From Swiss-Prot:
Belongs to the CTP synthase family. One of its GO terms (biological process) is pyrimidine nucleobase biosynthetic process. This is CTP synthase. PANTHER family: CTP SYNTHASE (PTHR11550), CTP SYNTHASE-RELATED (PTHR11550:SF0). InterPro entries: Class_I_gatase-like, CTP_synthase, CTP_synthase_N, GATASE, GATase1_CTP_Synthase, P-loop_NTPase. Catalyzes the ATP-dependent amination of UTP to CTP with either L-glutamine or ammonia as the source of nitrogen. Regulates intracellular CTP levels through interactions with the four ribonucleotide triphosphates. It catalyses: UTP + L-glutamine + ATP + H2O = CTP + L-glutamate + ADP + phosphate + 2 H(+); L-glutamine + H2O = L-glutamate + NH4(+); UTP + NH4(+) + ATP = CTP + ADP + phosphate + 2 H(+). CTPSs have evolved a hybrid strategy for distinguishing between UTP and CTP. The overlapping regions of the product feedback inhibitory and substrate sites recognize a common feature in both compounds, the triphosphate moiety. To differentiate isosteric substrate and product pyrimidine rings, an additional pocket far from the expected kinase/ligase catalytic site, specifically recognizes the cytosine and ribose portions of the product inhibitor. It comes from Pseudomonas putida (strain ATCC 700007 / DSM 6899 / JCM 31910 / BCRC 17059 / LMG 24140 / F1).
Amino acid sequence: MTRYIFVTGGVVSSLGKGIASASLAAILEARGLKVTMLKLDPYINVDPGTMSPFQHGEVFVTHDGAETDLDLGHYERFIRTTMTQNNNFTTGRIYEHVLRKERRGDYLGATIQVIPHITDEIKRRIIKGAGDADVALVEIGGTVGDIESQPFLEAIRQLRVEVGSKRAMLMHLTLVPYIATAGETKTKPTQHSVKELRSIGLQPDVLICRSDHPVDASSRRKIALFTNVEERAVISLEDVDTIYKIPGVLHAQGLDDFVVERFGLQCNGADLSEWDKVVDAKLNPEHEVTIAMVGKYMELLDAYKSLIEAMSHAGITNRTKVNLRYIDSEDIENQGTSLLEGADAILVPGGFGLRGVEGKITAVQYARENKVPYLGICLGMQVAVIEFARNVMGWKDANSTEFDRNSGHPVVGLITEWADATGAVETRDEASDLGGTMRLGAQDCQLAAGSKVHDCYGKDVITERHRHRYEVNNNLLPQLVEAGLVVSGRSEDGALVEVVESKDHPWFVACQFHPEFTSTPRDGHPLFSGFVKAALAQKNKA
């Protein structure tokens, strides 16, 4: 029988509900419990798939092809459970489903209202997403008091009553600011945040007090007194130098013991030795490299959250401090390749649209010609093919149809718009995949023996997650291969190019998939680990 921990946030946004929730989940998992996590987003978009990276940050793709909130990436990095489309839903998705049922007549002519129809659908999805887990942590996006969050808060209020206090609890994250001039932390914002919760029928069972200073015992006692929360359940969570310390911080204050006792669960003690090893490797590196990351969303690094974390994981695996030099690809267009000088390797991640693409192509050329280790991901592979066609084959008009529909050499094109030898457009079956023209979710990939990518994975067949509309044009592929482009990975049916490499280069790998979505701090990822090793070799050679 599943127990539920509902997680809310107060005072301000960006307190780290996802990290705190995932850290608690990691401790409970370390005690032998089956744990899952859900993220409920109050915005009206159906999913984040079409949202601007500058506003929303990264779109995290699940194994089954759902485009979800970046917090699901945190969940998968902290616990072993694989997230699915059932682990994330939005207001837009809820209303879409309810309205579809209304149009079908499923409500038998009833007046459709927020209560009970919207709240019932929210509760149904929470229960479905929890599945057969021992404990499900359910994070409500936004901040208590936001008008968008009200149906979700009402739904969890109802669900707490329905399942009973032995199966549901509320964990509230709140800001406890430190006033430097007074030399003390202030508890009043937390008191008011809890008051707001209680006004809608929600009494927190646990308070996570976020601060840049430790919240001392006297402050915690005061908070407990004014909020009706047990003193042992008022947890201090100050800023740390690595988020992978947080499971240990929460465990040291007995949060998991409180949860287990409250739910009456019989389980083992927590073994956090894996996390201790991660923290030790992170904070005590033996080597150091600098990697230039050339992207187009550098104003909001959350747009590359999983990728940045994956590079950190590769550093942990190699006992190496990885310094990422963030470079806007438009700056390369304006200032040239001097921005890349001194980097031990170059990383070009994915993206959509024309802006900044020429800067990425220039970065690829610099890496190829100067024998600097290169890793391209998604668009990073496509620009590698374009650069090869332009500068090795001499096809100066080579491009992707995403950027130039009239290119004389469209080496990259929409999955549905291949032209055959006569110029007629060929429609591919992939058009019916989830997401229409978007290829989403886990796909098998066959690796060529003896290739760099095969050396990294040590396997003939791998499974990685995709999120793209464009692919290498198979009609021009034979000429590209004849000129020296190495195709080292193909889709399971052999029809699509998944990985390319460069001959006579120490380490040049570009993949169409997104390996960052499956990297974790405890296991790392073979491709990123190999990339950092190549960067180390480059640095030592210099």
